[in-house]
């Protein structure tokens, strides 16, 4: 396997079949390795996991502070690298997360906005882009043209489920099953029929906007919300914004 591949294991570690063998396999490579799990489902890593993975720990609200302390302390005790990811669905969640970060002096953290189907106003206020956001983002000529061809968020990523089904994006149907198809067949099908790797801003209303290729590649939020333009730009008058 190429060393520039990133391996990510997601889910409840206790339910991953033959986990020790999987770790032994991954340990043969110098590639980046991540474990992505919930702080509630977190299992104290076995000795084979020590210092091999970067742990990305998702935290949802309401937070069980006692369990969070147990999880973070177990990682610290084994000198594992970890980052806390707060799943934020409201301004109240954000403020509570900051209280925890400051009280427990958390150094490595991220805020991950979560769309619930009922918090579109929160997204419009805090996630949707303004014209100033778009224009203040630095970009090379190379990146400008890359965005016209591929999706920077999804390109090259595959998700292998426990039953062998392979998704280029878990929001779309499986492309193939790894037990019956080769990696070559998977890549060929995604390039020819898939919706993820080549998903760019060529749909309405983005295809009529002067900022079309300055914006980030479409993300999972566009799929979940069912809207292609998560911004406040008025395409008919780019100097005005839809607030």
Residue ranges and their predicted role:
Residues 25-29, 44-54, 68-79, 101-104:
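Acidic (Asp/Glu)-rich catalytic clusters
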Residues 1-12, 16-29, 33, 208:
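Long, charge-rich, low-complexity alpha-helical segments
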Residues 67, 74-83, 88-122, 227-243:
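Non-catalytic interaction/Regulatory regions outside core domains
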Residues 2-6, 31-32, 54, 79-83, ...:
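A broad structural signal for short, well-ordered beta-strand segments within beta-sheet-rich domains
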Residues 175-243:
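Flexible mid-to-C-terminal extensions adjoining Fe-S/redox cofactors in radical SAM and related proteins
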Residues 8-17, 35-43, 56-66, 84-92, ...:
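Structural motif
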Residues 46, 70, 95-97, 169-171, ...:
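A short acidic (Asp/Glu
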Residues 100-172, 214:
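A C-terminal junction/extension of Radical SAM enzymes
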């Amino acid at each position: 396997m190429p060393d520039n591949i990133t391996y990510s294991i997601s889910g409840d570690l206790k339910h991953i079949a033959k986990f020790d063998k999987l770790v032994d396999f991954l340990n043969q490579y110098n590639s980046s390795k991540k474990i992505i799990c919930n702080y509630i489902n977190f299992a104290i890593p076995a000795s084979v996991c020590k210092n091999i993975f970067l742990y990305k720990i998702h935290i949802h609200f309401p937070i069980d502070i006692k369990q969070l302390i147990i999880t973070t302390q177990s990682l610290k005790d084994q000198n594992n690298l970890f980052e806390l990811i707060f799943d934020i669905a409201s301004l109240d969640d954000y403020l509570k997360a900051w209280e925890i970060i400051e009280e427990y002096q958390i150094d490595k953290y991220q805020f991950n906005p979560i769309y619930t189907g009922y918090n579109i106003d929160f997204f419009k206020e805090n996630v949707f882009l303004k014209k100033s956001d778009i224009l203040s983002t630095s970009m090379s000529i190379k990146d400008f043209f890359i965005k016209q061809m591929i999706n920077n968020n999804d390109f090259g990523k595959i998700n292998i489920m426990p039953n062998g089904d392979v998704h280029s994006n878990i929001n779309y149907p499986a492309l193939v099953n790894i037990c019956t198809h080769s990696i070559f067949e998977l890549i060929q099908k995604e390039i020819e029929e898939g919706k993820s790797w080549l998903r760019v801003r060529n749909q309405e209303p983005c295809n009529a906007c002067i900022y079309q290729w300055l914006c980030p590649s479409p993300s999972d939020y566009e799929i979940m919300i069912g809207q292609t333009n998560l911004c406040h730009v008025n395409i008919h008058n780019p100097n005005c914004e839809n607030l």
